[in-house]
């Protein structure tokens, strides 16, 4: 049996998690695990929209081996999420989504009014027009949205790669679906598919191809509101389309500085929204023997992809007095971003390290956020 405790703390998140796994719950290899986590995220520090979330997650995971290479996972869990949005800062479409699906949320913090009646014998909060009643409180621009979700997920995986860390042959397939049960505050579903293919071309060169696809939407009582924005897919950065800043591809919401003619403007303070549709992938040439150091290899790559809004309609916000949505909302081939570059992977004693240098081949907008040199340390999940 395995027991683990994990603590994470960085500029945008704090997370404490506990996990227990019995890998041989039955004689035929069925595993059972339990996970409990508490986390806080400040999305404004993570190249996403400006809101915060406080989360409690509890789940049970069942793993069923089908063959030596195939397995199925079943997950059932409960999520308690408290989102905080900020009037004038959180993108208008996000607040509208929550108000439409959950109903209006009162603002906070609230403060008592000043001593408007100028009467020292009455309490400061007394109404100046009616000393027997208090003044109404003045409330700020924060809004709290409590969300309770009961969810389930199932996934299939097939892995024929010859090495988990630095493979040179074989394939990896992963397909999954996640959904919330009817009766949850928001009814949604998500599909995902991941594919990797490795083939040696000779003793010193390996070809790799991969793709990562995703789609999500709402259903049932949530109607056609769309996938909850806090469940969106993201693209850009070391884990998808290198050469662009992490999470910044796809629709973004920002201020609109007018230009002449009045129908045009300059985007400012862009907040990436992610999307309900994800289409990304890569082609890569791996050089496993170019550097003799163990656990190290160099590659040359071509990345492609983007994320799109899906069923959510951002068009009504494009003439908003508060801001507008910029970028590619709907899927199209000319919206697919391309980048090319080189990368170094090193399985260092202190953890995996990856360094890449890439340049975009078809940056479409002036506000595309380019980041040529990217560095990651540790495994990301």
What are these regions (language model features)?
Residues 193, 337-339, 357:
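Secondary-structure boundary/capping motif
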Residues 284-286, 337-345:
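Short glycine-rich, acidic/polar surface loops and turns
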Residues 299, 341-345, 354-356:
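Active-site scaffold segments
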């Amino acid at each position: 049996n395995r027991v683990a405790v994990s603590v994470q703390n960085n500029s945008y998140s704090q997370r404490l998690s506990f996990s227990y796994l019995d890998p041989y719950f039955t004689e035929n290899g069925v595993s059972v695990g339990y996970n409990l986590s508490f986390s806080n995220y400040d999305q404004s520090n993570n190249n996403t929209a400006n809101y915060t979330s406080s989360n409690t997650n509890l789940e049970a995971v069942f793993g069923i081996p089908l063959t030596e290479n195939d397995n199925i996972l079943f997950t059932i869990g409960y999520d308690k999420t408290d989102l905080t949005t900020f009037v004038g800062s959180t993108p208008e479409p996000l607040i509208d989504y929550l108000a439409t699906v959950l109903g209006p949320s009162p603002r906070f913090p609230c403060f008592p009014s000043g001593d408007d009646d100028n009467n020292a014998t009455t309490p400061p909060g007394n109404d100046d027009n009616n000393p027997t009643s208090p003044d109404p409180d003045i409330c700020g621009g924060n809004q709290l949205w409590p969300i309770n979700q009961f969810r389930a997920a199932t996934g299939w995986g097939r892995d024929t790669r010859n090495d988990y860390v630095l493979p040179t042959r074989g394939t990896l397939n992963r397909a999954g679906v996640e959904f919330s049960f009817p009766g949850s505050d928001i009814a949604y579903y998500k599909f995902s598919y991941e594919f990797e293919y490795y083939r040696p071309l000779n003793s010193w060169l390996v070809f790799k191809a991969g793709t990562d696809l995703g789609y999500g939407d709402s259903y049932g009582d949530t109607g056609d509101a769309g996938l909850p924005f806090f469940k969106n897919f993201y693209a850009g950065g070391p884990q998808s389309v290198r050469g662009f800043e992490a999470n910044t591809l796809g629709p973004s919401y920002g201020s609109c500085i007018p230009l002449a003619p009045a129908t045009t403007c300059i985007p400012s303070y862009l907040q990436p929204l992610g999307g309900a549709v994800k289409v990304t992938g890569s082609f890569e040439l791996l050089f496993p023997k170019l550097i003799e150091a163990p656990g190290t290899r160099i590659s040359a790559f071509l990345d492609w992809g983007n994320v799109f809004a899906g069923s959510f309609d951002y068009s009504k916000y494009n003439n908003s007095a508060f801001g507008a949505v910029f970028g590619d909302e709907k899927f199209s081939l000319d919206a697919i971003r391309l980048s090319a570059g080189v990368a170094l992977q090193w399985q260092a004693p202190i953890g995996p390290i990856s360094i890449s240098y890439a340049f975009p081949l078809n940056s479409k907008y002036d506000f595309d956020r380019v980041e040529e040199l990217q560095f990651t340390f540790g495994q990301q999940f």
